[in-house]
Amino acid sequence: QYCQERFIELVPNLNSFGHFERWLRHKPYKQLAECPEGFRRDDPFMVRDHGSVLKPNQNSLDFIDSLYDEYLPHFSSKKFNVGLDEPWELGQGWSKPKVEKHGKHKVYLKHLEGILSLVEKHDKSMEFWADVILENPENAQHLPSHASPIIWGYEGDHPFSSQAKSVAECGLNFSLAPGTANWRSFSGRWETVRKNLHSACTNADEYGAEGILLTTWGDCGNHQPWSTMYPPLFLGSQLTWRGKDVNDEKIGTFIDRTVFHSPALGLGQALIDLAKLDQIIGFNLPNNSLPWFALFSAQPEKLPQHLAEQLSVHELQNGLDWLNKISSENFSSENNPNAKLAELEWKLGIDLSIAGINHAICMISKGINSSKIANNQPPLKKRFQDIWLQRARIGGLHEALSLLEKALQN
């Protein structure tokens, strides 16, 4: 109802193959998993004691269909995004003989056709993430004409051009999905999001995409402050509707005027300045900001060497100096609750980033007492919790807090 009143089409989205771990970790559903006892993979590195992918069989389709029966009546949109991305362990467990005989992509495509039949039974048109199909672009030729792939990519150099060309040549309706680049980050990644959005919008126009789906995610706990999404959201709006880039100052003013109803506030520009942190440090790792990576790396035993090979203490200190400089900004937000909350989020992003950089310095330097630095940090966990509850439901908070607490203790 909220969306309908604002002329927004709310498209249902339900993972229907991979990213199903929140079901498959529980005993009643374990038998549906490709690898019920868990799996390991190297790229990207992950070790799990439960599955994340459904078996590509009829039992899984029947279960998914039962979820569609419950879920889809709540949406008026004729579109339905079924996910189907990143089936990490496909071919490692139940489907291994099939994958060895026919290949992963044929097994995947057959299961996709089963999902498509369920979607059409519910009188919806299917959208799905295109990453598996694009592992071999020729696969696009084998897609049903009424399935709509969404080509996603979140870095500045993502090959939207070649991927969009491959799908467009098959006559399929498709969309391009850049990202806000603020997940796995406390600050956002402004240089990355500028390049990523510009590339996506340019290639969407050139190859006749149906549109742009600007995505934001919550990988590993949604630790990014909510307001770090504003600069990418406004830049994306500008590029998709106007097709012309604008400078940072104008984006900042748009945010101040539209979100905070105070054109001279300065908080919009401050959010952009925070998002320049990785650029100031000279750090560029896909899908990561340096402070977040230092605290949450999936392979902490390799982290000191990895950081030492990429960065110097001097470069990390440049990041701290930048954060100290921008944190001195003051805003007249006392009588503006929306701006006040965003300012609290901005300050939390700064302090979480400082904690991450200090941790990185400790790992690559000798003679620095990490416990002393940790003890000097403000009560980040409590602030994170308080701000979360001002924005969001309690669901997910315990998991996010547990991960954050563990990262800060380490």
Where are the language model's segments positioned?
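Aromatic- and acidic-residue-enriched carbohydrate-binding clefts of CAZyme catalytic domains
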Residues: 1-9, 20-62, 73-76, 86-110
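Substrate-binding groove of N-acetylhexosamine-processing glycoside hydrolases
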Residues: 7, 58-79, 86, 102-410
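Short, small-residue-rich loop/turn micro-motifs
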Residues: 14, 36, 84-86, 178
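Short, ordered loop/turn segments at secondary-structure junctions
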Residues: 15-16, 217
